[in-house]
Swiss-Prot record:
EC number of this enzyme: 6.3.4.5
Pathway this chain belongs to: Amino-acid biosynthesis; L-arginine biosynthesis; L-arginine from L-ornithine and carbamoyl phosphate: step 2/3
Gene Ontology cellular-component annotations: cytoplasm
Subunit: Homotetramer.
GO molecular-function terms, A-Z: argininosuccinate synthase activity; ATP binding
Pfam family, one: Arginosuc_synth
Binding-site residues for L-citrulline, renumbered to this chain: 90, 95, 126, 130, 179, 188, 264, 276
Family assignment from sequence similarity: Belongs to the argininosuccinate synthase family. Type 1 subfamily.
Binding, ATP: 11-19, 39, 120
Protein's name in the database: Argininosuccinate synthase
Positions contributing to L-aspartate binding: 122, 126-127
Keyword annotations from UniProtKB, A to Z: Amino-acid biosynthesis, Arginine biosynthesis, ATP-binding, Cytoplasm, Ligase, Nucleotide-binding
Main location: cytoplasm
């Protein structure tokens, strides 16, 4: 038996892993009081009966908090504004959720007078880092228990056997081959046939989005309104953060929007293969990018791409509660001052195509950009600009003797 703890707060989902962790903690840590904590960030029916299940498993109580509003407003929308995408593809749905869940878990632990925190993350994954960095930020003195790094359970079969031996009620079976994570932003799928990156995902695996081939044969247009980079309306109707994202999820899912297949580099050093569904998030990303094209000057837009890359790494690595993230957010907020307007998208069989954008403070001037001659832009001025801009190229050529045909 490990060192005794008196009270532990467990990050709890009600799935197979966290269900068996409850009796395992009691068995291996001196029969502590186990309090379960679950954040509602958009799992929908996965939350049904969760409190009763936790208590039946041996927990003394189970907190279930609706954090959807905070999640969308304070995590997803800043992520959207930053432009962060991990390794060109992943919209960071799982990564960005962990800091909020772990922070509230730590706060509950302090409120309850617990002396330990526990999570069900595997020793091979990124989530263990995300949870524990957050614990360090909010409850650095509490003991952290990570059963997957301690116990002898090595497979789904082992976990099901343990559940049966300890009378833990679970709905999981050996046929449930995929490891999934769901919230209001996305659904992820790993494991099963995806462990071979050559395998095409089975259509039956997808749970949020329609097969693009079976999507409507007529395109649908959607207009997203933004105020200083924050989405506020859909097709002219003003909506709160949660309702707006749920609306776009429904619209996007119908048209098969937001499916990606990615082999990614995990923080812990290995590569993993996952499939993600992010219908509403994909629509918002395309719309937001389109509006930034109008409202950001070239230097700011290009440098923001650099920031976006680092922001994505920061979120993926679990470094949300750091001075760097606060500093990057401050930069991003300045860039969003004029990102107010509308973007129009055409949704058709898996594609979200930007087909229109307008903004009150647009930097696009049709009088200057037009191919027709006007007094707004003297094309003769380009001659001097080219000479100055190209001077380093000319000097290098003269140095190497190119002007005389030398080689």
């Amino acid at each position: 038996m490990s060192a005794k703890v008196n009270k532990v707060v467990l990050a709890y989902s009600g799935g197979l892993d966290t269900s068996i962790i409850v009796p395992w903690l009691k068995q291996n840590y001196g029969n502590p009081e186990v309090i379960c904590y679950c954040a509602n960030i958009g799992q929908d029916d996965e939350l049904s009966g969760l409190e009763e299940k936790a208590i039946a498993t041996g927990a003394s109580k189970c907190y279930v908090e609706d954090l959807r509003e905070e999640f969308v407003r304070d995590f997803l929308f800043p992520l959207l504004q930053s432009g962060a995408v991990y390794e060109r593809t992943y919209l960071l749905g799982t990564s960005v959720a962990r800091p909020l869940i772990a922070r509230r878990q730590a706060e509950i632990a302090l409120q309850e007078g617990a002396d330990a925190l526990a999570h069900g993350c595997t020793g091979k994954g990124n989530d263990q880092v995300r949870f524990e960095l957050t614990y360090m930020a909010f409850a650095p003195h509490l003991k952290v228990i990570a059963p997957w790094r301690e116990w002898n359970i090595r497979s789904r079969e082992d976990a099901l056997d343990y559940a049966a031996e300890h009378n833990v009620p679970v709905t999981a079976t050996l046929k449930s081959i995929y490891s999934r994570d769901r919230n209001i932003w996305h659904m992820s799928h790993e494991g099963g046939i995806l462990e071979d990156p050559w395998n095409e995902p089975e259509e039956a695996m997808y749970t949020l989005t329609t097969d693009p081939e079976a999507a409507p044969d007529e395109p649908e247009y959607v207009v997203i309104g933004f105020e200083q980079g924050t989405p506020v309306s859909v097709n002219g109707k003003r909506l709160g953060p949660v309702e707006l994202l749920l609306t776009l999820n429904d619209i996007g899912a119908k048209h098969g929007i937001g499916r990606v297949d990615l082999v990614e580099n995990r923080l812990v050093g290995m590569k993993s293969h996952g499939v993600y569904e992010t219908p509403g998030g994909t629509i918002l990303r395309v719309a937001h990018q389109g509006l930034e094209q109008l409202t950001l000057d070239r230097d700011t837009l290009h440098y923001k791409d650099v920031i976006a890359h680092r922001y994505a790494e920061l979120v993926y690595y679990g470094q949300w509660y750091t001075p760097l993230r606060e500093a990057l957010d401050a930069f991003v907020r300045v860039t969003q001052r004029n990102v107010t307007g509308e973007a129009r998208l055409k949704l058709y069989k898996g594609n979200a195509t930007l087909v229109g954008r307008r903004a009150a403070k647009s930097l696009y001037n049709p009088d200057i950009a037009s191919f027709t001659m006007s007094d707004s832009y003297n094309q003769k001025d380009a001659e001097g600009f080219i000479k100055i801009f190209g001077l380093p190229v000319k000097v290098q050529a003269l140095l190497e003797g190119r002007s005389r045909g030398e080689r």
